[in-house]
Regions:
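Short amphipathic alpha-helical segments
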Residues: 4-5, 78-80, 104-105, 123
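Alpha/beta-hydrolase fold catalytic core
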Residues: 2-63, 88-89
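Alpha-helical elements of Rossmann-like donor-binding domains used by nucleotide-donor carbohydrate transfer enzymes
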Residues: 42, 77-80, 84, 114-122
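Active-site loop/oxyanion-hole signature of alpha/beta-hydrolase fold enzymes
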Residues: 49-50, 57, 96-123
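Conserved HGGG/HGGXW glycine-rich cap/lid loop of the alpha/beta-hydrolase fold
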Residues: 52, 57-101
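Alpha-helix termini
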Residues: 10, 64, 82-83, 108-113, ...
Length: 123
């Protein structure tokens, strides 16, 4: 009986610890206007593609190059590259839906084929 009480107490302790850790790390979303004031720059543009507001930049002239970021990033991943490339190329950088200043997908689908379709519609 004593051993089962210890196990029960340990389970309750672990569960409460997890709840405290999880709730302590919850943060509110930063309002879009605050994000725009920090991350929008003179090259920033917005266009609606397939019902999604997409943040992109279009700089330079010449053969176009499209730069796409990875998971958890934005078009700013390419800031240093774009600075050099735009001297000889037209550089388009896109923030994919659900990241940075681009809006979310209303259907909440974020698969590769969805990004390919969005890119196809964008160009």
């Amino acid at each position: 009986m004593f051993k089962s009480k210890q196990i029960f107490t340990a389970i309750i302790f672990v569960a409460l610890s997890l709840v405290i850790l999880i709730t302590a790390n919850i943060t509110k979303d930063i309002p879009l206007k605050d994000l725009k004031s920090e991350f929008k720059n003179e090259s920033s543009r917005f266009v609606e593609v397939d019902g999604i507001l997409v943040h992109y930049t279009d700089e330079g002239e010449g053969t176009p190059i499209i730069l796409l970021h990875g998971t958890g990033a934005s078009l700013h991943t390419w800031d240093l590259w774009a600075e050099k490339l735009k001297e000889n190329y037209r550089v388009l950088r896109i923030t994919l839906p659900g990241f940075g200043l681009s809006g979310p997908r209303l259907d909440k689908r974020y698969e590769i084929k969805d990004y390919v379709n969005l890119l196809d519609s964008f160009v």
